[in-house]
Structure formats: C-alpha cells, structure tokens
C-alpha cells in the first residue's frame, strides 16, 4: 500500500530544477553575472529560484514566445528575487553575455544557436526530451563538454545529441559522463573558464521518489497533511 499521495507534477518540477542547480554548482564558473531563462512555464519558475541557490547573479533575463506571459512572469517573481529581472525581446538578446542559460521551452526546433553563446557559459538543457526534437543547434553540442543525468536515457531520448549523432557529427564518446560521476570525482567537470559546458536533463524516476519521500517525512514530522483510509 502507498504511504502517501501527493501532486507528482509539483515534485517533478522542483526536483528537476534542483538537479539543474547541482549541475550548475559543479559545472558553471564560480564568478557569474548574467542568468538567462528561456521559457515562462513551471520549469522556468523552478529554475529561477534554484539557480539563485547556487550562484549570485547581477541580472536575470527572461524570454518567451508570448511577451505578455514574460511580463506576467517578471511581475509575479520580481519581488521574491534580489536580482533585476529583465524582459528579453528575442533569444539572441536573452543569452547575450549570459554565464548560465536554462532552456525550459516546449520548442521542437532549435531556438538557441552556438554563435550567440559566450565562451565559458554553462547551459542546462531541460525542455526537450524526445529523440527527434531539440531546443538547440548541433554546434552547441559539438562545441561543448556535454554532461548528462543518466546515460541510458540520453542515448534514447536526448534530441540534440541524437540528431548530431544521426548526422555523423559525433559519437557516444562525446558524452563526458553523468553528473553523478562528476560529483563523485570519477569524471572531470569544468577545467577552464573558457570552455562551454552543457548539462542535459531528462529526469530520473529515483529523483522523484527521493524528493517525494523527503516531502513525506517532513509532512509527517510537522503534522501536515490529511490521513486517509485506503
């Protein structure tokens, strides 16, 4: 029997952004100034807060296809973040000089191109999780040190990697390793302030379970929630 029932979408949103934050902690440069978030949905919100847990930014630029949604997003969160939130008219201006970039859109075709990315940037690629879809162009994958959350999922679902592989631009050896291997010291992370690093997020079920159990334990310890009979 289950020990708890909770909203899985909220758990997934938080743990996804938390995983990106861990990757950012280990792969991004220590000294950063600008954060760029592409998207205005639930993951954009979660990443806005999670990124600020691991790095201090002087400016955060937000882009989305719908300008009204971008402004609504900024108005909703600007008083909760001690950093200037800026509306970006297009993707190019959003990522200009950005030190950390989070792509959290539903785009099936590339919206982000390598020519716009500064040297030393770190990217969290989150939005696309289907083999034939990608938010970024192949050059970004080729020019970056490419890290993943789970290798098996990457080889089946990471669109930007699989598209580049299908076009014979790279092979599996281009994957630097799983972020867990970097954390454990089994793989090297960033080795210079000029290289571009990418973290591909596809999600791992065990992360959801761990996050849900943490919420359950806290709810139980603080007498929060409702006891029901099944």
Predicted regions and their residues:
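Conserved beta-strand elements of the Class I
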Residues: 35-36, 197
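NAD(P)-binding Rossmann-fold cofactor-contacting core
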Residues: 53-78
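Phosphate/diphosphate ligand-binding glycine-rich loop within oxidoreductases
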Residues: 1-32
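Glycine-rich Rossmann-fold phosphate-binding loop(s) that bind the pyrophosphate
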Residues: 39-41
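Adenosine-phosphate binding glycine-rich loop
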Residues: 133-230
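N-terminal Rossmann-fold NAD(P) dinucleotide-binding loop
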Residues: 44-45
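Rossmann-like adenosine-cofactor binding region
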Residues: 83-169
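Short helix-loop-beta connector
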Residues: 27-34, 56, 118-119
